[in-house]
Amino acid sequence: MDVINLIKNLKQILRTANNERHLIELKNIFVKQHLLPLYDELKKSANKKEMGLLINNFKQQIEFVTDQILKELNDKDDQVDLKKWTNKTLFAPFINNGHHHILNSIIDDIASFFKKLNFEIVSGSEVVSPIYNFDHLNIDENHPARASADSFFINSIKMLRTHCTTTTAQFLENNVNKDIRIMSFGNVYRKDDDDATHSHQFNQVDFVWVKEGLTVANLKWLIDSLIKYLFGQNLKTRYRLSFFPFTEPSFEVDVQCFKCDLKGCAVCKKSTWIEIMGTGMLHENVLKAANINDIRTGMAFGVGIDRIAMLKYEIDDIRYLYSNNFKFNAQIK
């Protein structure tokens, strides 16, 4: 990649701008054409560290040149004598193509993956009954999540769902098929203090597959395939025994850090592994609550879309995803 000539070309393009807005639009077009494709190449690169430094340097030069041309543009405006000349030209706005928000794009990617496996894609209501949010998912009466300090209750029989498993539980109960495949997605709500890694509202994807003969081996194959589909690499996965009321056995799934080549970094907290989702085989009490009393088994997992976005695009603050900041949104398409 010839960075020097690209930057020269950028200067020529930006100097055609008539105002600051036009300048930013021209810069965004350049970034979309020349910078963003490099991130796709980075996924396939054998030397990610060297290429990552090159991309970062290219990005910094783009910002520096943009600021430089903007200053020239502002200085030029200051020199105009309005008494002698007035620009009466009406410029037509430069229209950029719209694009999906990063969270919607990731949800679309996951939905596309599951559609190929004949899964039914559902969303469901965000206002649900505690019966489906807790009771049908084997969450006992003394579980902390049932407290008003942890969940948003509208009244004694209505609440904001705390996970999309609630929706899959509802569809599971009403499904008469022998082979049940459901993927649900949408907003979930928990009483967390908003900070760099937590939000009271976030997006989640949940899946349930019920069929005769399903085992942990099937579950691991499906998750490994999804991770490869999302990140475009043959990332190693690690399954750690855990506990969730609605699955048995339960696992936490980690992926090998794709940023540091097993050297340890801030993303993986020096562990070389990144926790990405919870999963397991559906608990027999969950199946019974859905009137499934035969020999079929089920498997499920839930994953936060916000977390996938932060890991995939190296976003260090979850609040950026909900800020409606044009400069931030324009960088990720």
Swiss-Prot record:
Chain ranges passing through the membrane: none
A GO molecular-function descriptor: phenylalanine-tRNA ligase activity
Catalytic activity: tRNA(Phe) + L-phenylalanine + ATP = L-phenylalanyl-tRNA(Phe) + AMP + diphosphate + H(+)
UniProt superkingdom: Bacteria
Signal peptide: none
UniProt binding sites for Mg(2+): E248
HAMAP family hit by this protein: Phe_tRNA_synth_alpha1
Name this protein carries in UniProt: Phenylalanine--tRNA ligase alpha subunit
Higher taxonomy: Bacteria, Bacillati, Mycoplasmatota, Mycoplasmoidales, Mycoplasmoidaceae
